[in-house]
Amino acid sequence: MQLLQSSVIAATVGAALVAAVPVELEARDSCTFTSAADAKSGKTSCSTITLSNIEVPAGETLDLTGLNDGTTVIFSGETTFGYKEWEGPLISVSGTNIKVQQASGAKIDGDGSRWWDGKGGNGGKTKPKFFYAHKLDSSSITGLQIYNTPVQGFSIQSDNLNITDVTIDNSAGTAEGHNTDAFDVGSSTYINIDGATVYNQDDCLAINSGSHITFTNGYCDGGHGLSIGSVGGRSDNTVEDVTISNSKVVNSQNGVRIKTVYDATGTVSNVKFEDITLSGITKYGLIVEQDYENGSPTGTPTNGIKVSDITFDKVTGTVESDATDIYILCGSGSCTDWTWSGVSITGGKTSSKCENVPTGASC
């Protein structure tokens, strides 16, 4: 009898253990987190992470760094952030083969109006940067709807990252928002940004360093346009193999721009601006300037950064009457081998201050 009872107990325990195994594996496969703390502590226990209506506490980062290879992250509901003056970031994601997505109807709202004071990163309140995609390699970010970043939107330092159909809407910051760059790219390779929609008050795209970068099918409204630079003065001062194409820039200070730092060294090469349409530009339609110092132009170009093998092809549109159509200020001998085709920017003034314009281009 004792032997029979022992056998029954053993069989019952064994069956319970077997039944528990699928439940445990399912938990590892998919997790839903409703707090930033739980997401941080449990992020490596699941292959699919759903972030549901998370309220990130003031002064904290929604920390999704060091994810397991192949993790999928889904933003669901509304993601919000507590108020504190600090540098951020509000969100940080890293890992390999990561997919960052959002559920239908989701939004990520920085509520930047709490920080906006017209000074951006140049003074006033200390404002947190929004989304660090650093070491987010062989990965993708798709379909995010982002609103009201306090300052910079995406800081990108990654390899093989695809960003598709992302919206950054800072239109509420027209009066007081400042330095709300959408995509800042540095020390990165093989970055592809496709189908971005941006309403902001600074660069729609700014590439400070990196190679094999594409930006296509973009819509940029209200900011400073599509920029290479500023290049120079950093540890990495090379921009090469960049294509910016099939995009619209409207109601912005600049259309397309290359800016390099005064008295610095570096390289800008094999950069193509193709099929770019401009309208409502208030400062410069097309600008290349090699005189940037402390964030402002000096009017005196230097030639330590070579700007070569540059293509402006079918960059067309209009600027406001008090704006300048085209402005090229190159250092002596530093702007070479440009291809200039189908460029037609009208409505503004013709600059009398262009210098060292390369053969084939016009100013």
Swiss-Prot record:
Covalent S-S links between cysteines: C31-C46, C204-C220, C330-C335, C354-C363
Catalytic activity: (1,4-alpha-D-galacturonosyl)n+m + H2O = (1,4-alpha-D-galacturonosyl)n + (1,4-alpha-D-galacturonosyl)m
Superkingdom, natural source: Eukaryota
Main localization of the protein described in the UniProt heading: secreted
Keyword Disulfide bond among record annotations: yes
Catalytic residues, chain numbering: D202, H224
Gene Ontology MF: a single term: polygalacturonase activity
Protein family (similarity comment): Belongs to the glycosyl hydrolase 28 family.
Location in the cell: Secreted
Name of the molecule in the record: Probable endopolygalacturonase B
Database matches in PANTHER family: ENDOPOLYGALACTURONASE B, POLYGALACTURONASE
Alphabetical UniProt keywords: Cell wall biogenesis/degradation, Disulfide bond, Glycoprotein, Glycosidase, Hydrolase, Repeat, Secreted, Signal, Zymogen
Gene from which the chain derives: pgaB
Residues in PbH1 repeats: 158-187, 188-209, 210-230, 239-260, 268-290, 302-347
Role, per record: Involved in maceration and soft-rotting of plant tissue. Hydrolyzes the 1,4-alpha glycosidic bonds of de-esterified pectate in the smooth region of the plant cell wall.
Glycosylation sites: N162
Cellular-component GO terms for this entry: extracellular region
Residues that make up the propeptide removed upon maturation: 21-28
